[in-house]
């Protein structure tokens, strides 16, 4: 149930206490890159959780950009809070907390199949999801590792910047659970895709874009001189 990346250093990554739901590889498309038709990013995605709409979900994702491109250094989501640097297993990650999109979330059918069905019928999903993202770049910024932990947002919390009475410690407790959800170790041999793939066909690849990955930039020709 451990994903081993091809990045340098190679990392062995997994969720600690959640069942493996599936692992797959595919192509993400970054449409705001300026590349004709969008920039294709080789992507390895592993998902952990029960997928019952009420239990946590954990994501291990590895994206590799083509030669001539690099991941930008800004690794936060719009409207995110509590941005900072977290260390997991001796590896530093930029972290932030945010509420996932209800309509453009690649993982909604995996974490909440009922909510995805309701959304497909032009309804409103019954739950919102809170996420803590950890991200870092490797191999001269050509590889990006994203770890993300999610839980359903309690119904009484309508804003993560103005918590209701009695909920002052909720976000801090959630972020602690997120920090403890992942195991990260340095692996001896890089081997992207070493985990046997198990189908997670419900993953909505059309939303595996800048919303999840963040942005990229091309190297200027002067950078190569």
Where are these regions (language model features)?
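N-terminal targeting sequences that direct proteins away from the cytosol to non-cytosolic compartments
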Residues: 1-44, 156-225
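Conserved polar/disulfide-associated segments of primarily extracytoplasmic proteins
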Residues: 27-170
């Amino acid at each position: 149930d451990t994903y081993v990346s091809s990045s340098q250093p190679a990392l062995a990554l997994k969720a600690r206490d959640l069942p493996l739901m599936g692992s797959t590889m595919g192509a993400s498309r970054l449409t705001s890159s300026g590349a004709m038709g969008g920039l294709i990013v080789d992507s390895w995605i592993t998902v952990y959780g029960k997928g019952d709409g009420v239990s946590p979900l954990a994501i291990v994702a590895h994206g590799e950009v083509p030669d001539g491109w690099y991941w930008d250094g800004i690794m936060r989501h719009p409207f995110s809070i509590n941005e900072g640097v977290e260390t997991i297993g001796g590896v530093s990650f930029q972290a932030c907390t945010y509420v996932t999109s209800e309509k453009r979330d690649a993982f909604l059918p995996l974490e909440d199949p009922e909510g995805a069905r309701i959304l497909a019928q032009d309804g409103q999903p019954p739950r919102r999801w809170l996420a803590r993202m950890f991200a870092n770049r490797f191999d001269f910024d050509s590889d990006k590792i994203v770890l993300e932990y999610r839980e359903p947002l309690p119904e009484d919390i309508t804003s993560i910047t103005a918590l209701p009475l009695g909920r002052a410690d909720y976000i801090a407790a959630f972020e602690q659970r997120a920090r403890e959800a992942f195991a990260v170790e340095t692996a001896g041999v890089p081997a992207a895709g070493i985990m046997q793939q198990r189908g997670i066909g419900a993953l909505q690849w059309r939303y595996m874009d800048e919303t999840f990955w963040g942005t990229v930039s091309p190297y200027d020709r002067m950078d190569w001189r």
